[in-house]
Amino acid sequence: MSVTMRQMLEAGCHFGHQTRFWSPKMAPFIFGHRNKIHIINLEKTLPMFQDALKFTKQVAANRGTILFVGTKRQSREIIAEEAARAGMPYIDSRWLGGTLTNFKTVKGSLKRLKDMEVAKEAGDWEKLSRKEALTNDRDLDKLQKALGGIKDLNGIPDAIFVVDVGYHKIAITEANKLGIPVIAVVDTNHSPEGVDYIIPGNDDSSKAVILYAHGIANAILEGKANSVQEILTAVKEGEEEFVEEGKVE
């Protein structure tokens, strides 16, 4: 779960945006500037990232769900891969307004998606006309693109992990309304407001995004492993107690 300063430097996490595009609220996390580009202070980023990883691990250990959100071209694939590796839901296409605050409606769309997949798999569409089958294929493709990553989400998540807060303001606003903790990478051109676990860093470099997402996914897997170990230990202790009580003097 550990991340080093060297890894962050090699991934270019310290490169911010042009100095003319900046949020004064990010000033505490800026080291200086070079060639009109803000340089992020990784001595501040590293402990903050580690705090985010600890929180992530704790949520996973409590069998919680963390929703990965990254819809920018350069982060989309990374977010989907790392979320899938950690066994968590993700949104890598456009964020649909109300995904969190109107989850009941979204749940209806998720049911439709699953029903359509089952029907297609069962060969039900073969009985339809060519036009009807094509329409269903198009509808299914749209649903899979928009909701495929959250297909198995049964309720609102316990936390969300966001890459690029400016790109996902609606997601953060919805999470804030519902009291869902937000873990997010925040670059120098955006405000960290509404983020509970701030990771000040470059949100444009693919290498940097891989580092963040990989770290979060690893923390989740470690948390899950701890949870399983605790259950096994509890079961073992219970069996030992049962044997002890069942002994006949």
Swiss-Prot record:
NCBIfam families per record: rpsB_bact
InterPro entries (alphabetical): Ribosomal_uS2, Ribosomal_uS2_bac/mit/plastid, Ribosomal_uS2_flav_dom_sf
GO molecular function, one term: structural constituent of ribosome
Keywords: Ribonucleoprotein, Ribosomal protein
Protein's name in the database: Small ribosomal subunit protein uS2
UniProt key word ATP-binding: no
Source organism per UniProt: Polynucleobacter necessarius subsp. necessarius (strain STIR1)
CDD domains, per the entry: RPS2
The family this protein is said to belong to: Belongs to the universal ribosomal protein uS2 family.
GO biological process: translation
